Amino acid sequence: MMSNKKAINILLAEDQTMLRNALATILDLEDNLQVVHSCATGKLALEYMQSDDGAKVDIVLSDIEMPDMTGLELAQHLFEAKARSNTIILTTFARSGYLRRAMDSGVKGYLLKDSPSHELIAAIHKVHQGGAAIAPELMVGSWMEKDPLTDKERRALRLAKDGLSTEDIASKLFLSTGTVRNYLSSASNKLNAKNRIEAARIAHQNGWL
């Protein structure tokens, strides 16, 4: 629903179709909120934001875990590109580490999916006005443990979690197999893990992947 005031244009990135459609309906019913585009992957969201239409987006509302590209990776790309939009993460994950990475990626809002719709709407308005909106239950735990992984270790572990071999990981990251082994070994040592699978599990549970 739109009033005479300029609408806040929203891009919605969520891989669950039913939830994506429900969110779009809720937001479009609100005064001065307009979902101008919705998509199921972070990669599609980034492609839209890099198009001419992307310049009109005020708020990117994104899930974290999506195919091709996570919401945190999407936020990082937009942050580095100095996009005029602001990003709000809406997720089921209250894991330690996610909020820290989100803030480092320029995210201005971080809410859980079980938050009431009025809190989400208020957060969108607050972020659009230059503020920040963080679910209070996330503020303490997310800062207790610092992410010990480098970006390269994180990328290698994420692919290991998906079951890829060292050779396949090396191919995807355009690295030598020896370099990949070093990254995985370093990550395992930092996390006190017995192997790459355990390291990936620990990192995932802490929100570091």
Question: Where are the language model's segments positioned?
Answer:
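Receiver (REC) domain active-site loop signature in two-component systems and cognate sites
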Residues: 66
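Conserved phosphotransfer cores of two-component systems
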Residues: 50-55, 77-85, 105, 206
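Recognition helix of helix-turn-helix DNA-binding domains
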Residues: 165-198
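Acidic, metal-coordinating helix/loop segments flanking the phosphotransfer/catalytic sites
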Residues: 38-59
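Active-site residues of response regulator receiver
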Residues: 63, 91
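Short, flexible helix-to-coil linker/hinge segments that flank and couple to helix-turn-helix
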Residues: 97-154, 208
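Conserved acidic carboxylate
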Residues: 14-16
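Acidic catalytic/metal-coordinating carboxylates
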Residues: 41-44, 70-74
